Amino acid sequence: LPFTIRAYFYGGSGEIKIVHSLVFDGDQNKYFIRSLGIRFDVPMREALYNRHVAFSCSDGGVWSEPVQPLIGRRILTLDGYGPLQKMQMSGERIPDYEKFDAKNRSLLDNWASWDSYRLSQLNADAFTIRKRTNGNNPWIGTFSGTRSNGYAFVGDVTGGLSVGYKDFWQSYPSSIEITNANSDKASLT
């Protein structure tokens, strides 16, 4: 499909505005465009528990979660540090894996990590956020609301990428998906 992309760069700003258009010159009765998206690859340099994702919710709220939440039936501990889960949820760096003793490393080795996340605005009054551990497992619902502003972030404690989709909820059905969050290169589409 022929398409045009315009990118706007502003001095002193880290923001890039992208406007795209495509020309569909096919037979609408014979061909159908199933989806259209722009994919960004994001390097993930930190341990799974130091990686984070976030989506905007209704009324300016934000849903966020670490790729590997430090929560389970046992509490992860490290001498000289306070509550590690609280640090993690605040976006602070959790110490390197090697600093933990064997018992705590076992917890880190066995706690779930989430690979994919999806924000979907399926109608004017409902969005969902779902996640899964890998492509072979089903999506599970984590949060729902009315109208998302269409913002997403994926990255680690050293940085990442955020995108905003203008008029997201008004453009339903729309979705923003993060995949490969537990690999060296996450994708945001």
Q: What are these regions, as identified by a protein language model?
A:
Residues 1-189:
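Beta-strand/loop-rich accessory regions of lumenal/periplasmic or secreted enzymes
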